[in-house]
Amino acid sequence: MNTLQRTQSNAKRQHADPGAWINVIAGNQEQPAWNVAAIMVKIRTSYELLKSGHASDADFDRVGAALNIGLIRAESIDPLCEQTMLRGIDAMYVCAGLHERHGTYGFTGPGIVAMNDAVDLYEEILTKSNGRQMTIAQEAAHVRLLKLINGVVQ
């Protein structure tokens, strides 16, 4: 090995991330309770605002994103979990329809029951999933949403 090759080889080694193992371990641990609580406070607050008819579009988007991410995780967990999330998403479609017709968000009676179950399930999924799993689910939900927007059918 000549001097130039040695110099290039050393340069490659210096660019490696010496703390990469920390990221791998942290990404494969369950969510800390404080993180789950912080996320769920925002989601539950937005959900309550949707129920009361005082929600903004951002509140609707927050709850919808949580359910879509939860659906991705639920698909890999259990068909019953998947059906629970799908019923919650259907309730969100009805909620959006009410907003288009009346100008305020809201749910029907069965929609409230479905949403209560879906939000509770999302909290359980968030608690039991590690950060890496939730990041993968978030990316998959984003890709699925882009396909839906662009009219690509799965």
Question: Where do the protein language model's features map onto the residues?
Answer:
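Arg/Lys-rich, low-complexity, intrinsically disordered N-terminal tails that contact nucleic acids
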Residues: M1-I22
